[in-house]
Amino acid sequence: MERLKRGALQLGFPLASHQEEQFRCFSDQLVKWNRRVNLTAITDPAEIEELHFLDSLTLAPALPEAVRLGGRICDVGSGAGFPGIPLKIAFPGIGLTLVDSSSKRTRFLSLLTTVLGMEDVVVRTGRCEGLAHAPELRESFDVVVARAVASLRVMAEYAVPFCRPG
């Protein structure tokens, strides 16, 4: 976890010991569940640290402080929880909604957020094109994030309905 600690510090926020433990637990759960559900091709703990956790945290400097302290984020096509879960670990005050079309992946995400002791996390199974019409999700988020979901043009079409006006 040293690489993760150094990287987070370089990005502008030190990790507390309980956050390091959450990342460690996340890595363990990811490797364990990946044996049953194809979540990621990356299973080496050092690579998980760098290619999943740190890569997800590179979004952190772009988040407005108001979002870091209690805004709402939607992670579209969350898959194994990237980038949403690392952002929630780094900024526990955010409200996080994880959206994925696979019920196998959303079962993993639900279990993971429980094991990590996370509050104010919602996991939804479905395609974002359909969920964007759900009244409780439409125009409800300060920030929408995604990783390796679609081209930028298509991703913008997916994300805009979830974003609060303004």
Model-identified regions with their sequence ranges:
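S-adenosylmethionine
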Residues: 71, 93-97, 101-166
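Conserved SAM-binding loop of SAM-dependent methyltransferases across substrates and taxa
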Residues: 80-93
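Class I SAM-dependent transferase core
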Residues: 1-70, 104-107, 111-122
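Conserved class I S-adenosyl-L-methionine
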Residues: 68-79
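Residue-level signal for inorganic ion chemistry
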Residues: 30, 87, 159
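Short capping/connector residues at structural and topological boundaries
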Residues: 44-47, 53, 90, 133-136, ...
